UniProtKB/Swiss-Prot annotation:
Disulfide bonds: none
Protein name per Swiss-Prot or TrEMBL: Predicted GPI-anchored protein 27
Lipidation residue positions, type GPI-anchor amidated glycine: 467
Top-level taxon: Eukaryota
Entry's localization field: Cell membrane
Gene that this sequence comes from: PGA27
Length: 485
């Protein structure tokens, strides 16, 4: 019996704190559940519903929409504001949701709520009565243990604010927000107006600056940039702008479209606070007429009056083709005029030397005069020959050479007869020949002369023709005689 009484006392001892803990855990769990349900309800209100009553996450709406002017649009369309209260499970299941829906028609008019204040007050009274707990514990007496008294103080929660007070607070907050939005709009309008005035002042200041036409500018152009003093008060007073420029207003609008803005004035001067200056630049450039280039033509080189390098090519290409007819006409008229300034100089060397040294060498000197100009008559290269002491000296020698002596012997008479000939030796004939003839090459110092040279260098054209006929007939007769014999 004693053992059973002690066992019952211990069981009661352990069960009482467990019961108290269960009550506390229930209250805390109820609070967390209510908070979670509130959050879920907010999400359900935000997400749109389709016909099947399922939320479409991809079509979620924003909480607050903002217009281009920076003003919130749907701030008065906020989701449900659920009343917070510590409720039991039964009250959470059966209680109705209280929502505050407000719509702003004007600044002072507000919509009424859907829940009456009397219903809300009754719900709060029920919550307070159910949450108050009063318990009394029995006393146990035993022989071994002293009596244990357990007294549990009643737990009462402080009553929350009524729905009327919360509703007033919500309306007050909404009024404050509306007032702030209106003040913000007024400030934005004033600021925009001040910025427009400032831009007009900048354009007019640019139009007054004189335009310099010189390439060198020594003085800096004064820039008239308005400076504004912005005074903002805490009572949302309008912005006061005081431009310091003395430019008349009538000149501002007319000169905006005529002149462009200079970028240096924007960069060098400090802009006013909370301003963004976006000015189009480089819009009034004059287009220059495109210059079409002349088509490139290859330069034409004039080859007339351009001397060649070799004398033989000059005579072959120019003199023989162009001057044969002129010399014929000059010989007929009795006048001999040369068309260039080329002179021939002859020298006679000893017979005992080499064969090449015995030839008559013609040295040609190219003068600075142009081709085609008339020069004095041809001078005979043998006009000054000193036959004394059997010496022949060339008078005009371009290079310093020692005079050469030749022993003529019986050739003096031949020289005299050669000098007394009526024909003259034209210089172009020798110039056209590739190889100089060896006319005076003989061991006996006799003068050799070509028949064809004698024919072409003497007389007129008729005499030349007759000479050729005679020579050709003689050659034919000689050949016939050789065949006969």
């Amino acid at each position: 019996m004693h053992f059973t009484s002690s066992l019952l006392a211990t069981l009661i001892w352990f069960t009482l704190p467990v019961q108290s803990l269960n009550t506390e855990s229930r209250t805390t769990s109820n609070n967390t559940i209510s908070i979670l349900t509130n959050h879920f309800q907010i999400l359900k209100d935000l997400l749109p519903y389709s016909k099947t009553s399922k939320p479409q996450i991809k079509e979620s709406r924003p909480l607050i929409k903002v217009s281009r002017d920076g003003v919130p649009i749907n701030f008065h369309r906020a989701p449900a504001i659920i009343m917070k209260s510590n409720k039991t499970d039964d009250l959470v299941r059966n209680s109705n949701k209280t929502m505050v829906l407000t719509e702003i028609k004007t600044i002072t008019e507000f919509a009424t709520t859907t829940v009456s204040p009397t219903q809300e007050f009754q719900a709060l009274q029920i919550n307070l009565n159910t949450l108050s707990i009063e318990t009394s514990t029995p006393t146990f007496q035993s022989h071994d243990f002293p009596p244990i008294t357990i007294e549990d103080t009643p737990k009462t929660l402080e009553p929350e604010e009524s729905s009327d007070a919360l509703q007033r607070d919500a309306f007050d907050q909404i009024k404050k927000l509306e007032k702030l939005v209106l003040d913000l709009r007024l400030e934005m309008k004033e600021q925009q107006k001040s910025f427009n005035d400032q831009l007009v002042d900048i354009y007019t200041a640019r139009s007054i600056v004189p335009i310099y036409t010189t390439h060198i500018v020594t003085s800096a152009i004064p820039s008239y940039v308005p400076k504004e003093e912005v005074m903002v008060s805490h009572d949302s007073a309008p912005i006061v702008s005081r431009p310091r420029t003395d430019i008349p207003v009538s000149q501002r609008i007319d000169t905006i479209s005529k002149h462009k803005m200079n970028g240096k004035n924007i960069l060098n001067n400090n802009p006013p606070p909370n301003s963004v200056l976006i000015v189009p630049q480089f819009q009034f450039h004059e287009r220059m007429a495109t210059k079409t280039e002349v088509a490139y033509m290859k330069p034409k080189i004039v080859w007339t009056n351009f001397p060649t390098t070799t004398a033989t090519s000059m005579f072959d290409n120019f003199i023989l083709k162009n001057l044969v007819d002129e010399t014929d006409s000059e010989i007929d008229s009795g006048e001999t005029e040369l068309s260039d300034d080329y002179y021939y100089y002859y020298s006679y060397e000893d017979d005992g030397k080499e064969d090449d040294s015995d030839e008559i060498t013609a040295q040609i000197l190219l003068s600075n005069s142009e081709l085609g100009t008339k020069t004095p008559n041809f001078e005979d290269p043998f006009e000054q020959i000193n036959i004394e002491d059997n010496k022949v000296i060339s008078v005009n020698t371009p290079k310093t050479k020692k005079p050469t002596t030749t022993v003529f012997g019986t050739s003096t008479s031949a020289l005299s007869t050669f000098e007394s000939t009526i024909f003259e030796i034209p210089k172009f004939f020798y110039g056209s020949r590739r190889k100089q003839p060896s006319s005076f090459k003989n061991k006996n110092s006799t003068i050799k002369f070509d028949v064809f040279d004698w024919i072409f260098e003497s007389g007129t054209t008729n005499e030349k023709v007759h000479g050729l006929v005679l020579v050709s007939s003689g050659v034919l007769l000689g050949t016939c005689l050789l065949f006969i014999l």
